[in-house]
Amino acid sequence: MNQSLLAPFGTAIERVEAGLNALRQGQGVLVVDDEDRENEGDLIFAAQTLTNAQMAMLIRECSGIVCLCLPDEKVKALELPPMVENNSSQYGTAFTVSIEAKVGVTTGVSAADRVTTIKAAIADGAKPSDLARPGHVYPLRAQPGGVLTRRGHTEGTIDLMQLAGLKPAGVLCEVTNPDGTMARLPEIIAFGAQHNIPVLTIEDIVLYRKSLLANVG
């Protein structure tokens, strides 16, 4: 059903291209995963261009659990251990310990403070000592190989940033309805139309990456 509902937005390749263009312009994208998986849509921004207004939108329109997707090597460089030793979550979402910037924040909860924390974490040469633990930003470790390894929003986010030529770090949060329930694809499409945000799927990113590999081959 996802593909049929998204058909008005073009092919899978065209939807990804629209998303990449939005990210390059400092705007957000909406990414929906497989119907037989979480069947949820995440609002995603590039970490390097994230603004306070965009963070406020994530907090206001989404679940409130704002996550910072990072590649494995960045997680290791920041010495961020897993949140739990044995991850028993349904889809193995790789949360690390939560973080806070050590400098430039007050309580760490405000939109501005969360942006400060994210900028501190993704800075070139960022050190473990730049971050306090725990905090109000939740890093997620992406699997090497991206969506071709794991079809999750974390990997999709990193893939999109790399395909857009941006730093491999993105911020996401699950879109919710006004009544607090999770937004599904019809609501995600309506939300995208309301805010002029392109919509694509994890499957689209898989197809896009496979097409690139086929062209190289």
Swiss-Prot record:
Highest taxon, organism lineage: Bacteria
Cofactor note: Binds 2 divalent metal cations per subunit. Magnesium or manganese.
Cofactor(s) listed in the protein's UniProt record: Mg(2+); Mn(2+)
InterPro entries with a match to the protein in the record: DHBP_synth_RibB-like_a/b_dom (IPR017945), DHBP_synthase_RibB (IPR000422)
Binding site for Mg(2+) 2: E38, H153
Example GO BP: riboflavin biosynthetic process
Record keyword Signal present: no
Pfam families: DHBP_synthase
A molecular function (GO) term: manganese ion binding
Keywords annotated in UniProt: Lyase, Magnesium, Manganese, Metal-binding, Riboflavin biosynthesis
Membrane-spanning intervals of the chain: none
Broad class of enzyme this protein falls into: lyase
The EC number(s) this enzyme carries: 4.1.99.12
Binding site for D-ribulose 5-phosphate: R37, E38, D42, R150, R151, G152, H153, T154, E174
Keyword Transmembrane helix part of the UniProt annotation: no
Any one Gene Ontology cellular component term annotated for this protein: cytosol
Positions of Mg(2+) 1 binding: E38
HAMAP family per the UniProt record, alphabetical: RibB
Homology family: Belongs to the DHBP synthase family.
Free-text function comment from the UniProt entry: Catalyzes the conversion of D-ribulose 5-phosphate to formate and 3,4-dihydroxy-2-butanone 4-phosphate.
Protein name: 3,4-dihydroxy-2-butanone 4-phosphate synthase
